[in-house]
Amino acid sequence: MAVGKNKRLSKGKKGIKKRTVDPFTRKDEYSVKAPSTFQTRDVGKTLVNRTSGLKNANDSLKGRIFEVSLADLQNDEDHAFRKVKLRVDEIQGKNCLTNFHGLDFTTDKLRSLVRKWQSLIEANITVKTTDDYLLRLFAIAFTKRRPNQIKKTTYARSSQIRAIRKKMTEIIQREASTCTLSQLTHKLIPEVIGREIEKSTQGIYPLQNVHIRKVKLLKSPKFDLGALLALHGESATDDKGQKVEREFKETVLESV
């Protein structure tokens, strides 16, 4: 009889499955906090694998980008067509402190703005804020009928489009380069820049639906924890103790 393995004996029983471990048992839940620029601070929750060995949970969370509707952040449905990107920069306890990372329009809103019989004017410019954030802002505008106009179309001439585009870039440059990122966010929420462009270009050609449709963050300065905590309404110097007043002691003279 030949000596060898008995294949029938070495086979295991069919149907026995490996015990599966639920991956969510190894995860922790963290709260995502928006900057104090927005009305609603609580964005939501995010999951991350618990710290084990050399893998730190905080390192996995830092740099995560969340896309949130501006309507949820401002409690106003009028802002539903705008999306804000928030980037996690610091972890404090179970809270992820975020900073502004960009802004964009929803696709359906952009498609609804483009119509027949009008000119579409676009402009983009790269600006640097006073706190050294390098941003690229994209503006969009559409021509509209003049008062008492009978003509169906509202097409602007090439020279008028160039003049409007020049005016748009000048206004964006002026408004964005003279403020911090937080102050610029305050301007973007109520469409301050769009209204300023619409008002300034009335003499060239009347405009409508003027928006900063997209903000792209190109470069951030060196991370500053104090600035981030100030943005979230906190302070890095909260742990300082109170000044203790010492009792008065009489001075003793060595010689009269």
Curated annotation (Swiss-Prot):
<dbReference type="InterPro" id="IPR018281">
    <property type="entry name" value="Ribosomal_eS1_CS"/>
</dbReference>
<dbReference type="InterPro" id="IPR001593">
    <property type="entry name" value="Ribosomal_eS1"/>
</dbReference>
<keyword id="KW-0007">Acetylation</keyword>
<dbReference type="InterPro" id="IPR027500">
    <property type="entry name" value="Ribosomal_eS1_euk"/>
</dbReference>
<comment type="similarity">
    <text>Belongs to the eukaryotic ribosomal protein eS1 family.</text>
</comment>
<feature type="compositionally biased region" description="Basic residues">
    <location>
        <begin position="1"/>
        <end position="18"/>
    </location>
</feature>
<feature type="modified residue" description="N-acetylalanine; partial">
    <location>
        <position position="2"/>
    </location>
</feature>
<dbReference type="Pfam" id="PF01015">
    <property type="entry name" value="Ribosomal_S3Ae"/>
</dbReference>
<comment type="subunit">
    <text>Component of the small ribosomal subunit. Mature ribosomes consist of a small (40S) and a large (60S) subunit. The 40S subunit contains about 33 different proteins and 1 molecule of RNA (18S). The 60S subunit contains about 49 different proteins and 3 molecules of RNA (25S, 5.8S and 5S).</text>
</comment>
<keyword id="KW-0689">Ribosomal protein</keyword>
<dbReference type="GO" id="GO:0022627">
    <property type="term" value="C:cytosolic small ribosomal subunit"/>
</dbReference>
<protein>
    <recommendedName>
        <fullName>Small ribosomal subunit protein eS1</fullName>
    </recommendedName>
</protein>
<dbReference type="GO" id="GO:0003735">
    <property type="term" value="F:structural constituent of ribosome"/>
</dbReference>
<dbReference type="GO" id="GO:0006412">
    <property type="term" value="P:translation"/>
</dbReference>
<feature type="region of interest" description="Disordered">
    <location>
        <begin position="1"/>
        <end position="20"/>
    </location>
</feature>
<keyword id="KW-0687">Ribonucleoprotein</keyword>
<keyword id="KW-0963">Cytoplasm</keyword>
